[in-house]
């Protein structure tokens, strides 16, 4: 099988839970609006803009690439993340992403009352809290009184593992099941069908995969050259077995071109 044929076969297996398809679908703010209306239980919610693969920079520490950053009609800034593997401390990841997004969107000298409201929506294939629920809201609670207090940061966790008959669960079926489409979610279903079943959509996904593969190969070569030139041999060795660390160094040292 040729390399192009292999890429086409891999492209057919993609679903919205996969980073590549999600980020492509998130180019359409109507898609983000539809899923956020369901997840945040707000049928009137509006998305003013969506930015897939938003680069959250941290000059003095770890930078991140957010799957999709959205600006909502009420002023909130939202990071939507999709995750298939339960392979790290994702609660800390949510906390960190929220902090990076907040600092990137806050100008110097801004008063604390004007720090933007930020919401991180974490969509996963697995039930992160093992509570047998498809949707979790994590609130800040005063331990002594049980009162919920708000500091402008929201954490919302959604998973595709629990099938509880809720609207969120139905949406997650479309996210993970190859043949699942639902008329309740016309934008999501239509976009998924276009990229999975039409020749034009499949061609677009293949082109994106080929481009990403080539760009990643070139960036890794650049990273290796930088590490060798700066004699960071321990870092170079670590990148051969720690893909998260390699990705971190790529973001910091070889940023993707806009």
Placement of each model-derived feature along the sequence:
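C-terminal segments that line or cap access tunnels to active or ligand-binding sites in enzymes
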Residues: 153-155, 160, 175
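Accessory alpha/beta interaction modules
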Residues: 1-154, 164-166, 245, 255
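Short, charged alpha-helical interaction segments and adjacent helix-coil junctions
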Residues: 2-12, 16, 20, 71-73, ...
């Amino acid at each position: 099988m040729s390399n192009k044929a292999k890429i086409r076969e891999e492209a057919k297996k993609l679903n919205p839970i996969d980073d590549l398809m999600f980020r492509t679908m998130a180019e359409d703010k109507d898609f983000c609006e539809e899923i956020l209306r369901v997840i945040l239980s707000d049928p009137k919610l509006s998305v003013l803009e969506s930015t897939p693969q938003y680069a959250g920079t941290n000059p003095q520490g770890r930078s991140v690439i957010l799957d999709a950053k959205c600006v909502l009609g009420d002023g909130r800034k939202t990071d939507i993340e999709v995750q298939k593997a339960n392979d790290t401390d994702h609660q800390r990841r949510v906390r960190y992403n929220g902090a990076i997004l907040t600092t990137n969107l806050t100008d110097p000298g801004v008063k604390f009352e004007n720090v933007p409201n930020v919401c991180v929506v974490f969509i996963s294939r697995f039930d992160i809290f093992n509570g047998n629920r498809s949707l979790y809201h994590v609130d800040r609670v005063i331990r002594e009184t049980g009162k919920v207090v708000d500091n402008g940061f929201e954490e919302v966790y959604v998973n595709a593992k629990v099938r509880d008959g809720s609207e969120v669960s139905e949406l997650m079926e479309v996210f993970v099941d190859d043949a699942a489409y639902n008329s309740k979610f016309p934008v999501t279903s239509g976009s998924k069908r276009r990229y999975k079943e039409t020749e034009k959509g499949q061609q677009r996904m293949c082109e994106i995969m080929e481009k990403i593969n080539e760009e990643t190969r070139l960036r890794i070569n650049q990273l290796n050259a930088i590490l060798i030139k700066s004699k960071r041999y321990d870092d170079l060795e670590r990148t051969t077995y720690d893909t998260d660390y390699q990705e971190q160094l790529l973001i910091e040292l070889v940023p993707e071109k806009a």
